[in-house]
């Protein structure tokens, strides 16, 4: 049996984020170890293949195509939380800065906000949004510290 991919679902007009959630995280695997915060509106998780250590995503629980579709209350909640998370990531991981990015611009999107740390040894600028992805390396102490700050 061939494994279904995010691209396969997108090509079929199916939101991969919603499909993944509805089918027991079959695409990304169990995210429990990477989940930093969750409520009825959104979930905040460390990325499985990060562009930098501490790369995090905030994903709306309900399906919205992009920021233009989300209710004002959700927008407020996500961005207030994002500010808190950015400061926490900077503190816990020692990042010089944390970029906030939302680029929902494909045939099948699900609103999300990415928080991508930039470290002092890295160049500034938008190229950080497309840095090569790396394998996720769990750091239980840092995850615990982030959870403590964010919850």
What are these regions (language model features)?
Residues 1-151:
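HIT superfamily nucleotide-processing domains
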């Amino acid at each position: 049996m061939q494994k279904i991919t995010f691209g396969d679902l997108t090509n079929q007009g199916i939101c991969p984020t919603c499909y993944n959630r509805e089918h027991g995280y079959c695409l990304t695997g169990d995210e429990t170890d990477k989940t930093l915060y969750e409520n009825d509106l959104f979930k905040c998780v460390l990325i499985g293949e990060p562009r930098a250590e501490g790369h995090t995503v905030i994903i709306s629980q309900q399906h919205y195509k992009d920021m233009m579709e989300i209710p004002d209350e959700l927008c407020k909640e996500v961005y207030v939380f994002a500010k808190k998370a950015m400061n926490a990531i900077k503190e816990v991981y020692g990042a010089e800065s944390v970029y906030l990015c939302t680029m929902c611009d494909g045939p099948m999107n699900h609103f999300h906000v990415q928080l991508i740390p930039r470290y002092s040894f890295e160049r500034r600028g938008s190229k950080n949004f497309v840095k090569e992805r790396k394998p996720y390396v769990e750091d239980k102490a840092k995850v615990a510290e982030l959870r403590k700050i964010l919850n």
